[in-house]
Amino acid sequence: VELGPNGKKLYVVAGNMTQLPSPESSLVPKVWQEDQLLPRMPDARGHARSVMAPGGWVCRTDPEGKAWELVSTGFRNTYGIAFNGDGELFGYDSDMEWDAGSPWYRPTRICHAVNGGEFGWRNGSGKFPPYYADTLPAVVDIGPGSPTGVISGSGAKFPSKYQSAIYALDWTYGSIWAIHLKPEGSSYNAVREEFVGGKPLPVTDAIIHPKNGSMYFAVGGRGSKSFLYKVSYSGNESTKAVSGSFADGKGLRTIRRSMEDL
């Protein structure tokens, strides 16, 4: 659950095994179908054979949880979401590890969860390739892993590029990825940088401390020991607060948002 940029809405993310909560409205056109040009090859181990579109989803609701609106769909199993300085929403989506080596394997990836977006998860071999006109590609592919927490670098006492980054945690490979965004059209592309790494380092979630600007992250799970770590900057670069917003592409993002509101 993530508080929206205006402080008035709660954004809720759920994986492909979680049913939609019967939202009263939808920003996503409800045109999803399970028709396939070629017969689907279901998962050989039986995973999610009976789970149909729209897969994982993002909804937003009021603080009381009374009115729900569907924002974005087609995810595999996104654990965490966060907003950047432009008020744009990003998630770290899971892969289906049993698909590894198949033509339809989709690695863990960072998705720009635009209003009305469809990211193409379908069970078995039915997943949409990123070049399909009715789906959206990732901002950046990460690779095999187990996504957990996602946070914004806003408020961190770090150099400016790290304040503007999105941080994505991978439990399996013990990495906290700094996702450095670059505007592209009305969206973004990105490069990843391993900000923190260790083996083992089963990272679960993180937060930027609102007072001291350090990053705190937790590790543990599945029988491993739990710890809490703190990351602080020590160096000569300025840590003066930056907005994290991008001037490049601002006009196009404004147009896209106006279209999303139609």
Task: Give short role names for the model-derived ranges.
Residues 1-262:
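Beta-propeller domains with acidic blade repeats across secreted/periplasmic ectodomains
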